[in-house]
């Protein structure tokens, strides 16, 4: 398959421009042989790098309207969608990405998720590495790293929706429009961690970046508080299976403290 059939689209906007140098430092460290054209979406700001082209949009207040403008400027069959705070943490196998891209054509898929969150609902005959994200699955579509058929992604986005509204509503819309053509991997094809939450650095991300010799300027973007980190850890530990067996009065007490 021709390399210009897939472009990498990093969705972002100007308020997150302080993250771009760090994102691309991690990106090119772990995917140094990326053969695909890379696009960075913003509003007006630019990022100067020989391997990165800019996509500009009007100053919309929502993710979806910006994404529509960005994606409409890309002329490719497929796009690999990522967000600007996905910090790559392991070397990307370019041959594996190319093989997964071939499966998009072979099985006429509209989306192939490269990070298993959530895992596929069921397997695919003859394909041990990918499975189906079935209709009705929670977060069937989201903004984790995914190879999209560009026209399908544009079809699922609605102007005015926030990123989180897109993830919820596009999953519902995809049930009718793309019932059997959304798949995902069982193991990460691209390994990364999310670095930003509610506009602040995750402390865990800062520790990982420090091991890489990367120290973000916290005067530009602060870190979450230790309390917020602890709360997130507890909420993650108290996952849905645990919450389901807790008595109501215990859940109500926990909700007061941890907002879940």
Residue map of PLM features:
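Catalytic core and acceptor-binding pocket of nucleotide-sugar-dependent glycosyltransferases
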Residues: 141-204
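Membrane-proximal basic amphipathic "stem/tether" segments
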Residues: 4, 11, 215-260
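Conserved donor-nucleotide/metal-binding helix-loop-beta segment in metal-dependent transferases, i.e.
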Residues: 91-120
């Amino acid at each position: 398959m021709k390399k210009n059939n897939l472009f990498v689209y990093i969705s972002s906007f100007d308020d997150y421009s302080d993250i771009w140098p760090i994102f691309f430092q991690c990106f090119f460290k772990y995917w140094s042989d990326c053969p695909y054209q890379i696009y960075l979406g913003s509003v007006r700001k630019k990022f100067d790098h020989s391997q990165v082209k800019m996509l500009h949009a009007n100053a919309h207040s929502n993710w979806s309207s910006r994404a529509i403008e960005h994606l409409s400027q890309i002329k490719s069959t497929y796009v690999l969608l990522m967000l600007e705070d996905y910090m790559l943490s392991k070397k990307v196998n370019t041959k594996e990405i190319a093989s997964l891209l071939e499966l998009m054509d072979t099985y006429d898929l509209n989306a192939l998720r490269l990070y298993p969150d959530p895992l596929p609902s069921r397997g695919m005959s003859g394909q041990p590495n990918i499975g189906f994200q079935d209709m009705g699955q929670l977060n069937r579509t989201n903004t984790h790293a995914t190879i999209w058929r560009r026209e399908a992604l544009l079809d699922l986005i609605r102007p005015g929706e926030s990123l989180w509204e897109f993830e919820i509503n596009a999953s519902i819309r995809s049930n009718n429009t793309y019932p059997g053509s959304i798949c995902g991997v069982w193991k990460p094809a691209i390994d990364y961690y999310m670095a930003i939450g509610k506009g602040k650095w995750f402390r865990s991300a800062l520790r990982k970046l420090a091991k890489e010799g990367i120290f973000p300027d916290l005067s530009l973007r602060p870190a979450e508080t230790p309390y917020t980190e602890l709360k997130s850890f507890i909420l993650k530990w108290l996952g849905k299976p645990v919450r389901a067996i807790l008595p109501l009065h215990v859940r109500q007490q926990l909700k007061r403290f941890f907002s879940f």
